[in-house]
């Protein structure tokens, strides 16, 4: 693949890609085959897998109509390209919606390393650098086909992303076969199923095939033989070194299938920091030592030039190193265990990714600058051609004008020729259409005028009716008002007081007050009864007022008496509380005095006593491990007796 990339990018690859140049095509394919197996295994458990920098394998649920208003829920695997990669290169992909109840796990490099002979850093570097090559190929608008073993093929052509799954993989995801038929029959997904893997591998030469990457740097590497013992037979294994000057490089031994099964049994959550002790196995006759199995990081691997370490001493009696507070077992475990600091490693990777992105951005900027420069040169050449053409045309026009300076563009005819018959027919048609338009316009104006006159007459009739109705209403209201006034005058005449008596001169009888006696008597009786009622009401009110005053006085007296009793009770309670407080204080003082005397006696006795009196001071003689809380001379034995423990001096098996 490096042969198709520019020389500047080849130099950059040699500087910033340390892992891929040390691997062959078969090893890269093996690593990605293990990655595909991990993805397929997680999809079989209905879990999605996220490959950082590439995309996510997950599931999508759809309802397919099978007829008669019946639907079947189908769950099919899908691949969603990473949004960052899509935005960077302007890729196009069909939008797929995945449900939120499907868990998505990241790519676990530790689990992949347990399945093959490569360590975690090698696998991670191979995956990331392969994705960098993929991003570079997409940026230069090349056709890319990325094969996932056992899953399908990811193709990118003309900035369009398409994931095609193998038919066997879809059948393993859905044993009923409905999913394969549904995808093959639908217009949008009919090209998402590969019926034959061999036929699809015959791809054109213009397409970049991933993950097989060719490197020229791997040709000069010398293989190193690592001999491992497995079942009593020595089998050589050739492994290529990264660099001869690299101190952290080392030989890797392919473990037996049994050991692979033991490694696979480890759960992913417990393999965050793996550092196994070197295991030495001696055969019964030859006494040969096998190479160590080490799953830690490359910084913790041994070189081939180092000799195998001898087995540690069986016991350590004194064990009095400076600051040593651990037993023999914990000390050996701490010396052989190397912690993996993921924070520093993560920061280092982030810095490396940023540096790669900066260099990649510089390359893209240079390419854009070169493209703009080429476009500018092409535009300049085109402008020069246009200017030369315009100059030639202007020169030709100028020469033509100079040759015929008295050329006129207008002409005068003495007699206008007659129009042909075809134009006469057209003129007749035009005149007929104009006459029709005039007639229709005239009819329209007449109809509008008639409508206006009709509306005016209707408005006049309506106005006349409204005026007549208003006149009738006015007359009706006037008649009602007249009748009202008449009834009022009749009532006044009816209720008119009697007239004054006629004047009689020299009359001996009284004129006024003849019938006033009876009225005065009735009036006086009414006044007397009213006064009597008022006197009774005043007396009852006064009596009620006096009774209320007496009741209030009695209530106030009772309240004062109750307040006095409560005050006396409060004073008595306060006196009791003060007395109790004084008594408690006196008792506390006596108790404190007795305790002080006792403490003084104990201090004097402690001063007279010898050292190592307390239990904690006595425990200093018995050193304990700070991790397992056993004695420091512990070499791994247990305080529990086995079932076949033989007691000395006895013939019993306990």
Swiss-Prot record:
Keyword terms, alphabetized: Coiled coil, Cytoplasm, Cytoskeleton, Phosphoprotein
Ranges annotated as biased composition (Basic and acidic residues): 212-222, 232-251
GO cellular component, one term: centrosome
Pfam families in UniProt: HU-CCDC81_euk_1, HU-CCDC81_euk_2
Polar residues: compositionally biased ranges: 293-302
Coiled-coil intervals: 431-562
Cellular localization per UniProt: Cytoplasm, Cytoskeleton, Microtubule organizing center, Centrosome
Domain of life of the organism encoding this protein: Eukaryota
Modified-residue entries (Phosphoserine), positions: 206, 273, 275, 296, 419
Start and end residues of each stretch annotated as Disordered: 196-270, 293-318
Protein name as it appears in the record: Coiled-coil domain-containing protein 81
The organism of origin for this protein: Mus musculus
Record lineage: Eukaryota, Metazoa, Chordata, Craniata, Vertebrata
């Amino acid at each position: 693949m490096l042969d198709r990339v520019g020389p500047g990018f080849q130099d950059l690859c040699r500087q910033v890609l340390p892992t891929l140049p040390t691997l062959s095509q078969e090893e890269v394919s093996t690593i990605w085959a293990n990655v595909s197996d991990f993805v397929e295994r997680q999809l079989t458990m209905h879990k999605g897998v996220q490959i950082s920098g590439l995309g996510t394998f997950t599931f999508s649920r759809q309802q397919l109509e099978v007829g008669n208003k019946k639907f079947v829920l189908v769950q099919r695997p899908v691949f969603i390209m990473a949004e960052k990669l899509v935005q960077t290169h302007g890729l196009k992909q069909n939008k797929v919606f995945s449900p939120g109840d499907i868990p998505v796990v990241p790519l676990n490099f530790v689990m992949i390393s347990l399945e093959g002979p490569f360590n975690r850093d090698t696998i991670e570097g191979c995956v990331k650098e392969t994705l960098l090559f993929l991003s570079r190929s997409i940026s230069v608008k090349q056709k890319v086909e990325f094969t996932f073993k056992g899953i399908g093929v990811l193709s990118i052509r003309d900035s369009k992303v398409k994931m095609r799954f193998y038919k066997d993989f879809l059948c393993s995801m859905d044993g009923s076969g409905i999913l394969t038929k549904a995808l093959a029959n639908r217009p949008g997904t009919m090209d998402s199923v590969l019926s034959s893997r061999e036929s699809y591998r015959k791809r054109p030469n213009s397409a970049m095939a991933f993950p097989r990457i060719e490197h020229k740097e791997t040709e000069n590497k010398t293989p190193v033989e690592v001999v491992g013992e497995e079942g009593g037979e020595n089998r050589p294994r050739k492994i290529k070194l990264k660099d001869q000057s690299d101190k952290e490089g080392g030989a890797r031994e392919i473990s037996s299938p049994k050991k692979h099964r033991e490694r696979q049994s480890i759960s992913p959550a417990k393999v965050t920091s793996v550092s196994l002790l070197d295991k030495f196995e001696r055969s019964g006759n030859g006494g040969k030592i096998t190479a160590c199995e080490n799953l830690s990081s490359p910084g913790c691997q041994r070189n081939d030039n180092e000799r195998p370490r001898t087995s540690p001493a069986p016991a350590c009696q004194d064990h009095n190193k400076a600051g040593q507070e651990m037993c023999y077992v914990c000390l050996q475990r701490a010396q052989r265990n190397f912690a993996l600091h993921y924070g520093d490693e993560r920061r280092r990777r982030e810095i490396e990714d940023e540096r790669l992105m900066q260099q990649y951005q510089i390359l893209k900027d240079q390419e854009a600058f070169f493209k703009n420069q080429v476009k500018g040169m092409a535009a300049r050449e085109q402008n020069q051609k246009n200017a030369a053409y315009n100059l030639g045309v202007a020169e030709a026009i100028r020469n033509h004008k100079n040759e015929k300076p008295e050329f006129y563009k207008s002409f005068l005819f003495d007699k206008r020729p007659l129009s042909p018959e075809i134009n006469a027919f057209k003129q007749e048609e035009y005149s007929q259409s104009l006459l029709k338009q005039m007639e229709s316009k005239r009819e329209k104006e007449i109809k509008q005028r008639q409508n206006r006159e009709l509306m005016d007459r209707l408005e006049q009739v309506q106005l006349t009716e409204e005026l007549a109705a208003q006149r009738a209403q006015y007359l009706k209201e006037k008649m009602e008002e007249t009748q009202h006034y008449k009834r009022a005058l009749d009532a006044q005449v009816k209720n008119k007081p009697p007239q004054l008596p006629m004047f009689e001169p020299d009359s001996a009888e009284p004129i006024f007050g003849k019938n006033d006696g009876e009225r005065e008597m009735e009036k006086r009786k009414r006044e007397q009864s009213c006064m009597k009622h008022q006197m009774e009401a005043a007396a009852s009110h006064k009596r009620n007022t006096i009774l209320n005053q007496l009741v209030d006085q009695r209530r106030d007296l009772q309240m004062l008496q109750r307040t006095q009793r409560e005050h006396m009770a409060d004073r008595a309670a306060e006196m009791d509380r003060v007395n109790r407080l004084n008594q408690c204080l006196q008792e506390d003082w006596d108790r404190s005095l007795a305790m002080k005397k006792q403490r003084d006696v104990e201090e004097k006795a402690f001063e007279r006593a010898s050292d190592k009196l307390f239990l904690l001071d006595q425990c200093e003689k018995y050193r304990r491990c700070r991790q397992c809380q056993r004695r420091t001379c512990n070499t791994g034995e247990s305080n529990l007796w086995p079932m076949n423990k033989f007691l000395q001096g006895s013939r019993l098996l306990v």
